[in-house]
């Protein structure tokens, strides 16, 4: 898969998965399970025709460098500004955030989502954890969430809304129009309601690049 942008054929919307680094395969599998067609996106030429995009978890600093190296960062921001639905998980949330409060030297985000995030807010890989989250927008039961070297939303701007928070009040899921972000990894738990929500957002947007 790493060397191909091949699409799955079907009747569902064509959803891209940013395939620079991270858990790309898991998101492709989930999206195809819902009947969506998928395309791996690495370069600007991969954007035309998609109706939505998932930015997977991984390492945000590496994604940032590669997105600039492959020339996709600027065109993707333009697509976001034009209303492309995008869902970012973990590092993908960092990439969508307008501000990274603890960015390393020269680290940038693509932006578009009116939030500030803090990287690795819960510690190292060994500090990963699981928790059940109340997500009113998704109803019952609670969402079982896995946090792996996860970011946290440090502040939510007026354009965005919090969808879920931990018991201590820290925000871990947000939405702003056609943009969706989670600190955790729904693709690894089997609770796929956030992906279903995103595909509903894609359908509601009714657009392609």
UniProtKB/Swiss-Prot annotation:
Q: What's the catalysed reaction? A: aldehydo-D-ribose 5-phosphate + D-glyceraldehyde 3-phosphate + L-glutamine = pyridoxal 5'-phosphate + L-glutamate + phosphate + 3 H2O + H(+); L-glutamine + H2O = L-glutamate + NH4(+)
Can you tell me which residues bind L-glutamine? 58-60, 119, 148-149
How is this protein annotated for GO cellular component? cytosol; glutaminase complex
- Name the UniProt key words of this record, in alphabetical order: Glutamine amidotransferase, Hydrolase, Lyase, Pyridoxal phosphate
Molecular function as annotated in GO = glutaminase activity; pyridoxal 5'-phosphate synthase (glutamine hydrolysing) activity
Kindly tell me the pathway this chain contributes to: Cofactor biosynthesis; pyridoxal 5'-phosphate biosynthesis
Q: Where is the active site?
A: 90 (nucleophile), 185 (charge relay system), 187 (charge relay system)
User: EC number(s) in its UniProt entry?
Assistant: 4.3.3.6, 3.5.1.2
Keyword flag Hydrolase:
yes
UniProt GO BP:
glutamine catabolic process; pyridoxal phosphate biosynthetic process; pyridoxine metabolic process
The record, for HAMAP family, names: PdxT (MF_01615)
**What does this protein do, in the record's words?**
Catalyzes the hydrolysis of glutamine to glutamate and ammonia as part of the biosynthesis of pyridoxal 5'-phosphate. The resulting ammonia molecule is channeled to the active site of PdxS.
Q: How does it assemble?
A: In the presence of PdxS, forms a dodecamer of heterodimers. Only shows activity in the heterodimer.
Per the record, the similarity remark reads: Belongs to the glutaminase PdxT/SNO family.
Protein name, as recorded? Pyridoxal 5'-phosphate synthase subunit PdxT
């Amino acid at each position: 898969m790493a060397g191909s942008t091949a699409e799955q054929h079907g009747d569902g919307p064509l959803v891209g998965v940013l395939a620079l680094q991270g858990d790309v395969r898991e998101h492709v599998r989930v999206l195809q399970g819902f009947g969506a067609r998928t395309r791996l996106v690495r370069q600007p030429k991969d954007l035309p025709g998609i109706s939505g995009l998932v930015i997977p978890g991984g390492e945000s600093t590496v994604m940032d460098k590669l997105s600039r190296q492959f020339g996709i960062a600027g065109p993707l921001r333009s697509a976001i500004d034009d209303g492309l639905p995008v869902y970012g998980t973990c590092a993908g949330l960092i990439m969508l955030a307008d501000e990274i409060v603890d960015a390393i030297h020269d680290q940038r985000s693509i932006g578009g989502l009116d939030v500030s995030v803090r990287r690795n807010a819960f510690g190292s890989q060994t500090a990963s954890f699981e928790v059940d989250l109340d997500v009113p927008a998704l109803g019952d039961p609670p969402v079982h969430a896995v946090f792996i070297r996860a970011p946290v939303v440090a502040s939510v701007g007026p354009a965005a809304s919090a969808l879920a928070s931990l018991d201590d009040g820290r925000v871990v899921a947000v939405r702003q129009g056609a943009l969706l972000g989670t600190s955790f990894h729904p693709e690894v738990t089997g609770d796929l309601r956030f992906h279903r929500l995103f595909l509903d957002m894609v359908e509601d947007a009714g657009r392609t690049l």
